[in-house]
């Protein structure tokens, strides 16, 4: 009898993902689900996702999930964490860079400044992926997108936001 090399985590549903070929969201989902299972958190975690490629993550994670308005996942996660009776519940957001670093920048920064007891999983592909690959706030200098076919020019588009480095400067962000 052969050795079992891979076993599907209980943290994922059986549904096939809708992601584009080569996209890392499916791998990230598997890794998050495996960690939740390893930590025995599948029954005590809540995922909050919002508009963008992450919008359908509730279809794939086999845990409680909530969908937030565009960019508002940290605010919704904060509300859940503060109001839930079991304070050990792991509440996390799963967001892309367009959602987190653009329309949700204020919510992201505010949650960090307040030191909210939530986890934010940041999927940075440096473009707006769901709508066709347009330049995002995190698009790298010189990176070509559908709206910057010659590459991001800092003279006209500014420099990319380096969200992890920005958040690392906030003492209350854990």
Task: Please report, for each region that a protein language model flagged, where it lies by residue.
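Short catalytic-loop micro-motif centered on adjacent basic/acidic residues
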Residues: 19-21, 93-95, 174
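Thiamine diphosphate
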Residues: 53-129
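Short aromatic-enriched loop/helix-cap "lid" or pocket-rim segments at secondary-structure transitions
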Residues: 132-134
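Active-site diphosphate/adenylate-binding microenvironment
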Residues: 4-69
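Generic secondary-structure signature for well-ordered alpha-helical cores
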Residues: 25-28, 37-41, 82-86, 113-116, ...
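Conserved active-site and cofactor/substrate-binding residues in soluble primary-metabolism enzymes
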Residues: 23-31, 42, 71-75, 106, ...
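Conserved thiamine diphosphate
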Residues: 10, 136-174
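Glycine- and other small-residue-rich loops at beta-strand/loop junctions that grip anionic moieties
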Residues: 21, 97, 152-156
């Amino acid at each position: 009898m052969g050795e079992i090399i891979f076993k599907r985590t209980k943290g994922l549903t059986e549904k096939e993902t809708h992601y584009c070929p080569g996209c890392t969201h499916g791998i990230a989902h598997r890794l998050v689900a495996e960690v939740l299972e390893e930590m025995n958190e599948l029954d005590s975690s809540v995922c909050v996702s919002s508009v963008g490629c992450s919008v359908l993550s509730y279809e794939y994670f086999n845990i409680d999930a909530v969908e937030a308005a565009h960019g508002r996942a940290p605010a919704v996660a904060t509300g859940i964490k503060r109001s839930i009776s079991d304070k050990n519940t792991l509440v996390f957001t799963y967001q892309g860079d367009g959602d987190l670093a653009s329309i949700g920048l204020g919510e992201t920064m505010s949650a960090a400044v307040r030191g909210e007891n939530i986890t934010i999983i940041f999927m940075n592909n440096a473009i707006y992926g769901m709508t066709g690959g347009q330049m995002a706030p995190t698009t790298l200098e010189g990176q070509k997108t559908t709206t910057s076919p010659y590459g991001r020019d800092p003279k006209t588009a500014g420099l990319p936001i380096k969200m992890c480095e920005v958040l690392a400067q906030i003492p209350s962000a854990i």
